[in-house]
């Protein structure tokens, strides 16, 4: 779909049934068609054709553990977990990702989240002992207490409050000049998606949702969020900002949002680029 956000549309077969099969993993590592994703820290390295860069196993660093990403047809694809922790990835990587094919952005996103999770979880959360990779890279096991740990995903609601044909966009202090986006926040323990949307809208902007409608979702690998996009009609357009979260908020109608999405030079604000779910959510609302 044209409105699908970045990091979706992956084409690898994740082949979960092979992750516990050590013999199959060994065969795949020995397959001449196997490739290892090139990363500089946590950032992708462009390949010769302008897509993701891949390395054959001949050039593979033997010190690195291999994380099984999946199958591209019959060809195994891996990411490398190196002994040294990577330097923090830069958000400037988003500029490169805009130039990659959509399915490759999805591959990179999954690899980045997985590699980053391993670097953050080298020790057991139960007993503190060192953990080791298992399940082809989709888990870590503690030999001391036998606890097993698996990659986590942090759910985030991102939503458009809607009233009288307009939607509410907010601006955080760290945003680039003129940038506004949909309001967002992490789900808390014991909360449903609908409850989180209502709470976040009221906390950040003082508006009360009368209903909540799910629209679409997006994995966001910085480091491991799942963005859950919703639209929520609200009782009133009166705004009461939480200035610890937002420095400004405003209502825009469909004509104004359409102008922003088209990049019209006269548009009074900017919104996140097509890679971000906020862009897809706004486009879905305009096209309703």
Give residue spans per PLM region.
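N-terminal strand-loop-strand
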Residues: 140-182, 186, 208-209, 232
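Active-site-adjacent beta-strand/loop module that shapes the phosphate/pyrophosphate-binding cleft
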Residues: 218-243
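A short glycine-rich, hydrophobically flanked beta-strand micro-motif that places a catalytic Asp/Glu
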Residues: 210-217
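Hydrophobic alpha-helical positions that pack around
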Residues: 183, 197, 201
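Conserved hydrophobic/aromatic beta-strand scaffold that supports enzyme active sites
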Residues: 68, 78, 123, 158-160, ...
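Nudix hydrolase/Nudix homology domain
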Residues: 1-121, 176-180, 243-288
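Surface-exposed, charge/polar-rich loops and edge strands
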Residues: 191
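Cys/His-rich short segments
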Residues: 109-160
């Amino acid at each position: 779909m044209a409105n699908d956000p970045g990091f979706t549309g992956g084409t690898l077969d994740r082949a979960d049934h092979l992750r516990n099969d050590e013999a199959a993993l060994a065969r795949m590592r020995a397959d001449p068609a196997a490739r290892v994703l090139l990363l500089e820290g946590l950032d992708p390295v462009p390949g010769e054709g302008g897509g993701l860069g891949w390395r054959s196993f001949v050039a593979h660093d033997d010190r690195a553990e291999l994380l099984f990403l999946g199958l591209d047809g019959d060809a195994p694809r891996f990411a490398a977990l190196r002994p040294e922790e990577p330097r923090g990835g830069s958000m400037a990587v988003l500029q490169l990702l805009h130039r990659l094919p959509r399915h490759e952005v999805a591959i990179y996103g999954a690899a980045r989240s997985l590699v980053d999770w391993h670097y953050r979880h080298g020790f057991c959360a139960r007993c503190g002992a060192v953990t080791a990779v298992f399940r082809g890279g989709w888990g870590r096991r503690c030999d001391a207490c036998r606890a097993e740990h698996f990659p986590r995903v942090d759910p985030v609601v991102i939503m458009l409050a809607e009233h009288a044909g307009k939607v509410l966009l907010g601006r955080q202090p760290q945003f680039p000049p003129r940038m506004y986006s949909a309001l967002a926040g992490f789900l808390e323990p014991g909360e449903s998606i609908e409850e989180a949307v209502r709470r976040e809208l009221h906390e950040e902007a003082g508006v009360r949702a009368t209903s909540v409608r799910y629209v679409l979702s997006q994995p966001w690998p910085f480091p491991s969020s799942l963005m859950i996009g919703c639209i929520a009609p609200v009782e009133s357009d009166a705004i009461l900002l939480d200035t610890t979260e937002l420095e400004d908020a405003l209502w825009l109608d469909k004509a104004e949002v359409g102008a922003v999405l088209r990049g019209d030079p006269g548009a009074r604000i900017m919104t996140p680029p097509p890679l971000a779910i906020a862009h897809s959510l706004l486009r879905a609302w305009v096209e309703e």
